[in-house]
């Protein structure tokens, strides 16, 4: 019976298996995260503020002129009900505008979870924390594109 009591002691002193998310903030009070989408990589810093979003030193509405891309950028902040509460500064490189907008969105989502770990469930449910792994399929030899064959003439 002594063996069983030892097991009970181990079971009661064991730590919970679920990871505890801790707030990650630097000396300036900012949270940092990287986001990726297609060939674009974004580095994002967020801090409490008035809701100003800058991308590569420009206001996001100037950098991303299309309203669809602006909406993509704001999705995680709106979903977390933190609109106008954080200043967001992002630098993004590589890819096109659509990939860059997706990369910044991914970075904002991760930075929000580092700043407020309680938002993780909301953002994960919205699919903002998942890295979209779809990339362009490579071109194969003997074909016109990745899957398109050259035109075939029967005669």
Curated annotation (Swiss-Prot):
Q: Which UniProt keywords apply?
A: Ribonucleoprotein, Ribosomal protein
Q: Which GO terms describe its biological process?
A: translation
Quote one Gene Ontology molecular function term: RNA binding
Name of the gene: rpsI
Task: Note the superkingdom of the native organism.
Answer: Bacteria
Q: What is this protein called?
A: Small ribosomal subunit protein uS9
UniProt cross-references to Pfam families, sorted A to Z = Ribosomal_S9 (PF00380)
Please give the InterPro entries that the UniProt record associates with this protein.
Ribosomal_Su5_D2-typ_SF, Ribosomal_uS9, Ribosomal_uS9_bac/plastid, Ribosomal_uS9_CS, Ribsml_uS5_D2-typ_fold_subgr
SUPFAM superfamilies recorded:
Ribosomal protein S5 domain 2-like
Q: Which family does it belong to?
A: Belongs to the universal ribosomal protein uS9 family.
